[in-house]
Every structure is written in structure tokens, then in C-alpha cells.
Design a protein with these regions (language model features):
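C-terminal segment of classical bacterial N-terminal signal peptides
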Residues: 2-9
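Structured C-terminal helix/loop/strand segments within mature extracytoplasmic catalytic/sensor domains
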Residues: 14-25, 143-145, 188-218, 229, ...
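Solvent-exposed, acidic/flexible segments
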Residues: 15-19, 31, 54-63, 77, ...
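Extracytoplasmic
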Residues: 29-34, 42-44, 50-52, 56-60, ...
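Active-site SXXK
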Residues: 44, 56-89, 95, 128, ...
């Protein structure tokens, strides 16, 4: 009745002042574009600021790839313990011409020493997410197929994400065939993982654990209080810096936060923006 109505009204007011604070911080950043998606996983509250703006997905596309791998494991199309060849020759989606990845452009170099050998699917997923290995990503995409990753993302409600290809396909890049996403698309995928809908409940718990082992923590986690865990993924390419995932407060409250940015040349500045937005969001969500 009345109490519930007034609680809802004060929540709406809290969300509105959060929106204003986030918009002010974005303006101050001088960014060309910023997309923010917040979804409370306890209450039916969400906040969207530029959440429909389209960005180059960068390494955020590794999240739907992980989801597809776990769904395939659930359906016994592959085994996580299965050891598959570590290769560094891939085919361009434009004309099938071969290309390889350069160690210098990859945030993880460990896998290159193992080309010609084998690695387990589980290990490749771990490298793809925690250290954002491009090589692991392309090996897994060849295994699960980008078109299937795309269909799964759409089925989960990420209705405008485009997962077209692996990483560093120069021909595709020149042809404008890029992986793109909105903050909302990614937020919907993280919510599906958090709520155990992206794959089996067991697989979703495992995906959260992998995301919690993320090594790049200069963005969202830097804005969170000690003891608050983020299960998240980052993405960085030239002047495009992203971070997003599932935040678990100490009292068990959980929410999804995604921040996508374009046009901030300085990585330290975009990291500060993400951390500040995380601080604002956490203050508002945890206070309610």
C-alpha cells in the first residue's frame, strides 16, 4: 500500500539524482560518447544513460563468446576439459584469406609460446576473460562459430549486439565489419549470467567466478569500497575504453553495471571516469 508507494517514489527520486550525477560526470570528462547501464538484481530498478549508443565492442565481445562455450558444454557439444590445438592462423570473414595475431598487440603473451601444442577449452576461456587473450578468443570463436554466438546473444535479449568475427581481422576492419554493442546489450548478458539464465545454473556460477578473476581492475573496481566484488570484463582499443559486469555488495545485494566510453585519449582518464561512475552507482544502489 502506502508504504510501498512511498518507498518506490523515494527510489525513483534516488535514481533521478543518480542520473543527474552521472550525466554531470560524463560532461566533465569531455568524452565523445558514454553509455551507462545499471540494473538492480534485487529490485526491478534500472537506469539507462546513453545505453542505446553504439560502440565498437572491443574485448567486450568475449563475454558472449564465453556464454556460447558454456552453453555448448552444457549441451555436450564440447567438453571444458577437452584439449584443442593452439593455432595462430585464422581466416578473414571477408574472403577467407589467412591472418595471424601479433604477440605485440595482445594483452596476453603466454599462449603464443604454445602454438603447435594444445590447451584445454577451460584454460582458453580463462585466458580470454581474465587477461583478455586475443589468441584464445580466436581459437574459441573458430570452435563455437561467431554466428552462433550472435544468435545466442539475441535469444538472451541483447537485441542489437553484433558479433561478426574474431579479433585483428584487418580485412574485415577495413570493410567496416566490426563487432559492435550498446551498454544495454552487455547489461542484458551480464544479468542473464547473474540470474542463471545464460546457460545452466552451474555454468553461470562458473562464469561469474571467471569474471571475478579479472586482472584489469583500474575501471569499475577502483570505484568500489573494499570487500565489494566485481565479476567483470574490460575492453580497450584506440580511444575506446569499456568495463562492465556484476557487482556484489557485502550485504549480498547485486547489480549490473556497464560503462562504455569513446573519445577519451588518455586511458587513465577513462579509467577514472568508470571508477567515478561506479562510486556514484554503488553509493545510490547500496544506500537504498
Amino acid at each position: 500500500g502506502l508504504l510501498a508507494t512511498s518507498a518506490a517514489a523515494s527510489r525513483a527520486q534516488g535514481l533521478e539524482s543518480l542520473r543527474v550525477a552521472i550525466e554531470d560526470r560524463i560532461r566533465a570528462s569531455g568524452a565523445e560518447a558514454v553509455g551507462v547501464y545499471v540494473r538492480d538484481l534485487v529490485r526491478p530498478d534500472s537506469l539507462l544513460v546513453g545505453a542505446a549508443l553504439r560502440f565498437h565492442a572491443a574485448s567486450m565481445m568475449k563475454v558472449p563468446v564465453m556464454i556460447q562455450v558454456f552453453r555448448d558444454a552444457d549441451e555436450r557439444r564440447l567438453r571444458l576439459g577437452e584439449r584443442i590445438p593452439v593455432v595462430n592462423t585464422f581466416r578473414s570473414i571477408v574472403d577467407g584469406s589467412p591472418y595471424g595475431l601479433s604477440l605485440a598487440d595482445d594483452s596476453d603473451s603466454s599462449l603464443y609460446a604454445r602454438v603447435g601444442g594444445r590447451a584445454s577449452v577451460r584454460e582458453l576461456v580463462d585466458l580470454m576473460i581474465t587477461v583478455s587473450s586475443n589468441l584464445a578468443t580466436n581459437i574459441l570463436i573458430e570452435r563455437v562459430d561467431a554466428a552462433r554466438v550472435q544468435r545466442t546473444a539475441l535469444a538472451l535479449g541483447a537485441d542489437s549486439i553484433q558479433v561478426r568475427r574474431g579479433v585483428e581481422d584487418g580485412q574485415a576492419y577495413r570493410a567496416g565489419l566490426n563487432n559492435t554493442t550498446t551498454a544495454r546489450d552487455l547489461g542484458v548478458l551480464f544479468a542473464a549470467i547473474a540470474e542463471g539464465r545464460a546457460a545452466s545454473a552451474r555454468s553461470c556460477r562458473e562464469m561469474v567466478r571467471i569474471l571475478q578473476r579479472q586482472r584489469f581492475n583500474e575501471g569499475i573496481p577502483a570505484g568500489l569500497p573494499a570487500g565489494v566484488r566485481a565479476a567483470h570484463k574490460t575492453g580497450w582499443i584506440t580511444v575506446t575504453h569499456h568495463d562492465g559486469g556484476i557487482v556484489s555488495a557485502r550485504d549480498g545485494r547485486r547489480y549490473v553495471l556497464v560503462v562504455l566510453t569513446r573519445g577519451i585519449p588518455e586511458e587513465a582518464a577513462s579509467a577514472r571516469l568508470m571508477a567515478d561512475i561506479a562510486r556514484l552507482v554503488h553509493g545510490a544502489v547500496a544506500a537504498r
